Amino acid sequence: MKTAALAPLFFLPSALATTVYLAGDSTMAKNGGGSGTNGWGEYLASYLSATVVNDAVAGRSARSYTREGRFENIADVVTAGDYVIVEFGHNDGGSLSTDNGRTDCSGTGAEVCYSVYDGVNETILTFPAYLENAAKLFTAKGAKVILSSQTPNNPWETGTFVNSPTRFVEYAELAAEVAGVEYVDHWSYVDSIYETLGNATVNSYFPIDHTHTSPAGAEVVAEAFLKAVVCTGTSLKSVLTTTSFEGTCL
């Protein structure tokens, strides 16, 4: 009597069943700002025992990402134990007097502004409010949320190192505190490694302007994010495949 051979069973480690979703702008997105640049989100998967879904979109702010339903789209598919990393700031400034659809309402709390954009009346929230609302969407699904400060523009652009954080760095930290989620000071960790690398190297990372990085630069920016994760003990550390990254803890 022949017995059927049992196929071997393979089980994925629990970390591999975890998904990390990214929400951001061109500095995080695939193909960055175009012309051969790339966003740092494209390099995270190399260091994680988790699936990475890069939902960053060029040209977006916290406001426009919200208006287009992109946070909702992530919330529709995220499951308990997944991560969502949110990083905006580059496109959130400007004036509402000539509304470009991206500028947030000025302030740090529940302030609201009103505008007509693309023929539609819009109630505009502050930058922290958009991030807090997004965080609540994801935590309600059991996801682990990390609010990250934006990356710096080229601090060596003038030939002299200049560290000048935008207000959105502080706002991201405030939003994380109010929402009760984790915060990564990506700005400071990128700035620190840029200062160490020096003028010539860092300038080579910005082939088209002072904002968008080359693939090599984007990988440095990704590693700086993970250095911050390791140094601050952020929960994402549990799915890292290495904890050895250049730079010092701040």
UniProtKB/Swiss-Prot annotation:
Question: Keywords of this protein's UniProt record, alphabetized?
Answer: Disulfide bond, Glycoprotein, Hydrolase, Signal
Q: Name one GO molecular function term.
A: hydrolase activity, acting on ester bonds
- Activity vs pH: Optimum pH is 6.0.
The record's active-site residues are S26, D209, H212
Task: State the source organism's domain of life.
Answer: Eukaryota
Instruction: Show which residues constitute the signal peptide.
Output: 1-17
Q: Any S-S bridges, and between which cysteines?
A: C105-C113, C231-C249
| EC number(s) given by UniProt | 3.1.1.86
Q: Which residues are glycosylated?
A: N121, N199
Annotated catalysed reactions:
Hydrolytic cleavage of 2-O-acetyl- or 3-O-acetyl groups of alpha-D-galacturonic acid in rhamnogalacturonan I
| Post-translational events | Carbohydrate at Asn-199 is composed of GlcNAc and Man.
Q: What does this protein do?
A: Plays a key role in the degradation of rhamnogalacturonan in the cell wall. Acts in synergy together with rhamnogalacturonase A (RGase A) and rhamnogalacturonase B (RGase B).
The entry assigns this protein to a family as follows:
Belongs to the 'GDSL' lipolytic enzyme family.
Q: What is this protein called?
A: Rhamnogalacturonan acetylesterase
Gene name, per UniProt, is rha1
